[in-house]
Amino acid sequence: RGEEGEVLVPALSHLASTEKDQLGSHRETELANAMKALGITDYRFLGAPSTKFRDSGMMGTEPNNRPDVFWQADVDAASNILAKIIDEIKPQILITYDEIGGYGHPDHIQAHRVAMRASELSTWEIQKIYWNTMPKSVLAEGIAKMKEIGSDFFGAESVDDLPFAKDDEFVTTLIDGGAYVDAKMAAMKAHETQISLDGPFFALSNNLGLQIWGDE
């Protein structure tokens, strides 16, 4: 539920994990608002209500070692929970993080492992499995545009500074989601503790728009 997330908005700093343990419940509300913006009514916390996997924090931090975090979960046990959901809803497509969890967050890596194992354990045959990623060419253009306006993209001087950037040759599929950009951006803004409105995400959106957020 994001209990260890970094709070980027000063006005909400009282929710930080270093304060009272209340960020998780606040982020549940953020998620509910994001799902409403996207028109999604069926979303779930893995294992809820009987099992709760806590946010593991960034790689190499102390929360990684807590026994109740997702990073420490038994992969087969967690995968069996997800496999039952797959058997229930019978999806055509499964989408998950890539093998490095996007930017290396332990919970994202674990989500990849659990999703892939669940696809093996479920009785339902999923037609396609996609790993979400960002091609280098798109990110390189984004960095160039940010430099033009005197800003930066998370401090990256070049695309090689971004560990989640994938060589274009490995990107097999591009889905045109241009019609959903407004809903997508509204959903992003719903995560108010995590994204600053004057930060690189929205600066990039203002300068590249559909070019970077319209495609999946």
Task: List each language-model region with its residue ranges.
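Metal-dependent de-N-acetylase/amidase catalytic core
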Residues: 58-216
